[in-house]
Amino acid sequence: MTRDNNCSNSARHKLSLMGVIVTLGIVFGDIGTSPLYVMKAIVRAGNPVNVEYIIGAVSCIIWTLTLQTTVKYVLIALRADNKGEGGILALYALIRRHSRKWFYFLAIIGASTLIADGVITPSITVLSAIEGLKVYEPETPVVPIALCIVTVLFFIQQFGTNMIGKLFGPLMLLWFSMLGVLGAMHIGDYIPILQAFNPLHAIRLLTSNPEWFLILGAVFLCTTGAEALYSDLGHCGINNIRTSWAFVKIMLILNYLGQGAWIIAHVDNLTSGLNPFYAIMPHGMLFFGIVMATIAAIIASQALISGSFTIFSEAMNLKFWPRQKIKYPTDVKGQLYIPFVNMSLFILCVIVILFFKSSERMEAAYGLSITITMLMTTFLLSAYLTIRRVNRWLTLLFLIVFVGLESIFFVANMAKFMNGGWVTMLLASVMIAIMYVWYNATTIRNSQIQIRDVRESFSIISDIKNDESIPKYATNIVYLTKLGGKYDIEQKILYSIINKHPMRADHYFLLHIDYQDSPSTLEYDVTTLVPDTLYRINLRLGFRIHPLVNRYFRQIIEDMVANNEFSLASSYPSLAKHNVMGNFVFVLINRIYSTFTSFSFKERLIMDAYEWIDHLKLSMTRSLGLNTSNVLIENVPLTVKLHAKKAGNSIPRVERIEENGDFY
C-alpha cells in the first residue's frame, strides 16, 4: 500500500476561479514578463526594420508560443506527470527504471542549464522594469536600484513568502489584463498587423533574411518561461494551468500585436534604446506601468528562486547533488529554503547585473542555456511516450518536430555565445561536472559494498546481546544501511557489531532509507529478524521529501510500542522502575576513499573530484536530521570487492505498510 502525503490530486488541483488566479502568480511570471524586452530585442536585431519585418517577427512570436509553449508543454508535457509533479527531474524519476542508464546525463544537463539560465531571469526582468524610469529621468541609476531590489528579494527568502505570496495571483491578473488592454489599444495603429497570425509571414521572414539567427534569438525570449510552466505542475495542477494559459496567451499576443502595430506606425521615428513596451503606454499611466512591471519582475524572480530550491532538493534525493541544509520557513507544504543555494544565486545575480549593466546587453546572453534544457526535456518526453506505448509514429513525429525546432533555436542562440552567452554556459558546465561526478561517485561507492546474509550472524548477535562481560554500549543501536534486501547486511556493519569492538545492546535496528521515483511517498515497513533483538526498517521517501530521519524514526518506534512489538523500558531494573526509557544511538558507517584503492583511471578521476566536492556537502548527521548527541560515526576504508575489476515545522505522518517481499 502506498501513501501520497499530499491530498489527492483531484482535491488539490481541482479547477476553480481561485485556482486559476493563484496559478497566474506561481506559473507565468517568467513568460509573462517577456513583453518587457522581446520586441525591443527584435527591433535591435532588424536590419532594416520595416512593415514586412515586424509582421514576420510578430508571426514568429505567435507561432513559437503556439508550437513550443502550447503544443509541447501545455498539451503534451503536462500529461507526463509524476504523481502530480512536473519538471525535468520529476520526469527523469518517472522513467529512469524503464530507460537506458545514460538517460541520467540528459536529466543532469537539463537541470543544470535550467538553473544556469535562471540566474539571468531575475536580473533581466528587474533591470527591464526599472529602465522604464529613464523615460522620466534619463540619468536614473538603474543598476543600484536593481541591486537593492534583488538584495531584498533574496534576503526575505529565509522568512518565507507565504503572506505576500497570497497577493501574487491577483497582481499578475492585473498585470496580464494591463498587457492585453495596452496591446488592444494600439492594434488600430496598423490593422494589417493581424496578418501575423498567418505563419507564412514568419517563414518568409526567416527564409529571406540572412540574419535569421539573430531574429530567432530575439524571438525565442518569448518562450523561455515554458520550462518553468512544466516544473510548477505540482503546485497548481494541469487543469488550472491549461485554463489560465488560455487567458495568458491571449493577453500576451494582444500585447505583442499592439507593440508591433505601434512600431510600424512610428517606424521612421525609432530611436536607439527605445522600448516599445513603455512606448505604447499613455503618458499618464507610465508611472503605474513601471510600478506594475517592477512588481511582475519581482514575482517572476520569486517563482524562479522557489523553483531553484525545489530543483536542488530533488537533485539531492536523486543523488545528483551534495546534501545541503534545508529549512522550512513556513508551514506551507513544499515551501523550503536552502541557504547555500540562496546565497549562491544572489551572488551570481549581483555579478550578472554588474557585468552586463543593462537589459539590452543581457538580452544578448539570455536564452542559450534554456534551449538545451528544452532539448533534454524533448528527449526524456519521447522516452516517456515510448514507455507509455503511445503510437510509435506519433512519438517519432513529436521527436522530429521538436528536436528540429529546438535545434534551430539552439543554433540561433549560439550567436549569443560571444556576446555573453558564455556566462550561462560556463555556469551550466560547472554544475554538470559537479552533478556528473557526484552521481557516478555515489554509484561507484555503492557498488563496492560487500553484502552478507544476516541470518548467518543471528546467533552471534544474540550471544553478544546476552554476554554481560561485554560493556553495554547502548540500550538500542540503529545502523543506517544502504541495503534494502530483507536479509542483506553490509560487511562493515557486521564488523562494527562483532569485530571492531563488540557493540552490545538490547536491540539492534537496520534502518534503510529508500528514495522512491514518486515525489511524495512517505511509508515504512518493519521486519522482525530476531525477536526482541534485531529489526529491519525500510523507510521509503519520495524524491521531494526531506529525510528528517530522527523525527520519522521516533514516530516508527512509537507505532511499534503501540503495537506491542517493542518496549522502550530500560533494561536496567533501577531505571525501569522509575519508567526511564532506554537510549538510542545511531551509528553511521563512513567509508573513506583511499588513494591506494584499486580503481580504473576513469573511476580514480571521478573519486578524486568527489573528494574535493565532498567538502561542500552537509555532514551525514545533519543531512539526515539526526541529533548529534546520539550519533556515532565510524570511519572505514572504501575497499574494492574481490571480484571487481581493478583499475521545525509540522511533519507529515509516515505510514506503515505490510511487507510484500524484499525491497532493493
Please identify what each model-predicted range represents.
Residues T2-Y664:
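The structured alpha-helical core of multi-pass membrane proteins
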